[in-house]
Amino acid sequence: MEKLRIGVVRGGISSEREVSLRSGEGIINELNKEKYDVKDIILNNKKDIFSALEDLDFVFLGLHGKFGEDGRIQAVLESMDIPYTGCGVLSSALCMDKDITKQIIKNYDIRTAKWLTVRAGEDYDYDKIVKYLGGKIIAKPNSGG
């Protein structure tokens, strides 16, 4: 019986590249090489992705951030009819936007911690933010990180 050809895509073009390289390495180390033909795909740019994914039966996504979790690599894989790990195009794209994700969660009455989106260039009053959110505050970019 022919081995299933599995590609592990890691690296990528986001600021989370180094984490992605380690994540992908962990996936590769755990795959049974006697059962699967494993192809290590270190993504350095978007232009090589189609040729790198040729002749694969399945893809493990070890990518993080931009072009990894934002729906774009998922769209490429779907256009090539290659099954992959993780969420689909729409859910990946929506979940990369923290503010939209929180609004969707709130819309379905799912409990979530208070949040506040502050956009670049907007004036804000730190004391009012602390009073609204309370206690310790974690600041993160809306997408990535």
Model-derived regions: residue spans:
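ATP-grasp fold ATP-binding core
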Residues: I105-K106, V130-G145
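Basic phosphate/pyrophosphate-binding loop/patch that engages nucleotide-derived ligands
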Residues: I104-T112
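ATP-binding N-terminal substructure of ATP-dependent carboxylate-amine bond-forming enzymes
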Residues: M1-L90, L94-M96, I100, N107, ...
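Short beta-strand segments
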Residues: V9, L116, K140-N142
